[in-house]
Design a protein with these regions (language model features):
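Extracellular/virion structural assembly segments
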Residues: 2-12, 26-28, 126-138, 169-178, ...
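Preference for solvent-exposed, low-hydrophobicity sequence contexts
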Residues: 1-205
Length: 322
C-alpha cells in the first residue's frame, strides 16, 4: 500500500488537496480511507472506495480552514506563528505525509516569499501596526531587519514549525520622531522581501480597516477621510382602528470613507475590500467585523494616481417602538 501526497503545503483549497493511492494489489478491493486532523487526532471524514486498485482522492471538502484568523492589536514588533491546520490520510496502518493548509487563496511557490496584495511602498500612521504573512518551508528560520530614519534598528529571529509566520510591525517600537521604516525579511539567510513605510501623524478623521485579500493575507490601510456618517431607518406601517402606526422599525448606521490619492497598485489592492469575505474596522483599540455595502468601485486603469470610496455598515438592528 502506498499513499502519496500530490499537493504541496499551502495549496489553496479551491485547487484541491490531492493524494494518490496505490494498493499494489493484483485484484481490486474495498478500501476505507480516513482523513485525520493532526493537531486533534480527530477523524474528520471517512471515504469508502469500492473495487479499487489505484485511486486519487481530494480531501479539500473535509478540511477546516483555520477560523482564528483576525488582525490582532500589537504594541510591539514581533514574529508569531500564522494560523494553519495539518492533515494526513490513513488506510489501515499506513499513513501519508502531512499537508499544511491555511487561508491563502493564491498558489504558493516552493520558494519562500511574503504573501501580500499591497505594494512594498506603504504608509503607516503613528501608533499603528501592519502585518506581513510569510510562507516558507516547514522548519525554516526567519529574520527581520527594521531600520528607522532616526538611526534605530531592530533585528528579529524566528523559527517557524508550520512554514507560515506573521511579522507584526508596530511604530510604537520606535522613537516618536520616526518618519520612515525600512523592513527587510530573510529566510535561512536569503532575502525574500523588502518594504518601505512612510510614518506620518494620524489625523482625527480617519478609519483603519483590515481585510482578507484575494491572496489570503490580512492587509491594513487607514482611510484618510470619514466624510459622511449616515443613519437610516425603515419602518413598516400598518393601519389600525386607531389610525396609522409603525409596526416595526429597522435602523442602520453606515460610514462613507475615502482613500488617499494612491498609485494604481495600491488602488487595485484596496478595491479587493469590496469582495473580501472578511473586513474589520479598528474601533476603540480593537478590531470589529463590519460589512462593506459598496456595490461598485471605480478607479483608473491607466496608471494615474486615483482614490476609491467605500461605504461601511457599522451596525443594523431592530428598534423597539415602545
Amino acid at each position: 500500500m502506498k499513499i502519496k501526497k500530490l499537493s504541496s503545503d499551502f495549496t489553496p483549497l479551491h485547487e484541491g488537496v490531492i493524494f494518490d493511492i496505490d494498493t499494489e494489489a493484483t485484484s481490486p478491493s474495498d478500501i476505507e480511507v480516513k482523513i485525520i486532523e493532526i493537531a486533534t487526532g480527530e477523524i474528520v471524514a471517512t471515504q469508502l472506495l469500492r473495487n479499487t486498485v489505484k485511486a486519487t482522492i481530494n480531501i479539500a471538502p473535509y478540511v477546516k480552514i483555520p477560523t482564528v484568523y483576525a488582525p490582532a492589536p500589537q504594541s510591539q514588533t514581533t514574529f508569531s506563528e500564522a494560523p494553519t491546520s495539518s492533515y494526513k490520510v490513513r488506510i489501515g496502518d499506513i499513513e501519508s505525509e502531512s499537508v499544511v493548509v491555511s487561508v491563502n487563496r493564491s498558489k504558493v511557490d516552493s520558494s519562500p516569499f511574503v504573501l501580500t496584495a499591497l505594494p512594498s511602498s506603504r504608509r503607516l500612521f503613528k501608533n499603528e501596526n501592519d502585518e506581513l504573512l510569510i510562507v516558507t518551508d516547514r522548519g525554516s528560520t526567519l529574520y527581520a531587519e527594521i531600520v528607522a530614519d532616526t538611526g534605530e534598528s531592530l533585528h528579529l529571529e524566528y523559527f517557524t514549525s508550520s512554514g507560515a509566520a506573521t511579522l507584526s510591525l508596530s511604530t510604537q517600537s520606535f522613537e516618536t520622531m520616526v518618519r520612515a521604516l525600512d523592513v527587510t525579511i530573510y529566510c535561512d539567510e536569503g532575502e525574500i522581501g523588502s518594504f518601505h513605510y512612510k510614518v506620518t501623524p494620524r489625523h482625527q478623521a480617519t478609519a483603519r480597516l483590515a481585510w482578507l485579500s484575494d491572496c489570503g493575507a490580512i492587509e491594513h490601510y487607514t482611510f484618510a477621510t470619514s466624510y459622511r456618517a449616515k443613519r437610516s431607518a425603515k419602518r413598516e406601517i400598518v393601519a389600525t382602528s386607531e389610525g396609522v402606526v409603525s409596526a416595526s422599525c429597522r435602523a442602520k448606521q453606515s460610514l462613507s470613507l475615502s482613500s488617499h490619492i494612491e498609485p494604481q497598485a495600491t488602488i487595485e489592492a484596496l478595491a479587493q475590500i469590496a469582495s473580501s469575505p472578511k473586513v474589520w474596522m479598528e474601533i476603540d483599540g480593537g478590531w470589529h467585523l463590519v460589512e462593506v455595502v459598496t456595490p461598485l468601485i471605480e478607479y483608473n486603469l491607466f496608471g494615474e494616481p486615483s482614490y476609491i470610496l467605500l461605504e461601511i455598515c457599522l451596525w443594523e438592528k431592530e428598534v423597539a417602538l415602545w
